[in-house]
Amino acid sequence: MSIVLRKSNKKNKNCITSKFYTIHIIKISTPVFRAPIAIGESPYVEWSCLQVVFRKDMVTKKTTFAQLITRLNHFLCQALKRRDSKTYILCRTAVFGAMTPFSPRKSHINNKLPMQPRKKKIVIIYVVRFH
């Protein structure tokens, strides 16, 4: 699943700008348990799109990107359990591309992650496995 982290601004009745962090989940891949797999065929089945919105109070100075993804992991596990009676395990394989800062201060970002200011997206690959 590819995730794009985007900062969106919404105005309320008092014209005060609130900041929301929206994560667009483009796809979730589920392994297909059958053999053999044809040459060039993807061994995964793609799921439908999801969207997660984090309120501004969920992203603080002490919240790192890794902690935000941990919350997203929990959300997805719960959503998948509600969707089907089977038990799912969400295994994360992270492929970090360029990163968008959560705010003008870079202190919110885990410094271990690579950052390229020209591109503004974070790509993370998830694999959902049946148990």
UniProtKB/Swiss-Prot annotation:
Effect of residue 92 to H: In strain: AS2.724 and AS2.820
Organism domain of life: Eukaryota
Outcome, altering residue 16 to L: In strain: XH1549
Other remarks on this protein: Open reading frame that exhibits genomic organization compatible with a translational readthrough-dependent mode of expression. The sequence can give a readthrough frequency of 9% when cloned in a plasmid with reporter genes. When the initial stop codon is bypassed, translation will go on to the second stop codon 321 bp downstream.
Protein known as: Bypass of stop codon protein 4
Species this protein is from: Saccharomyces cerevisiae (strain ATCC 204508 / S288c)
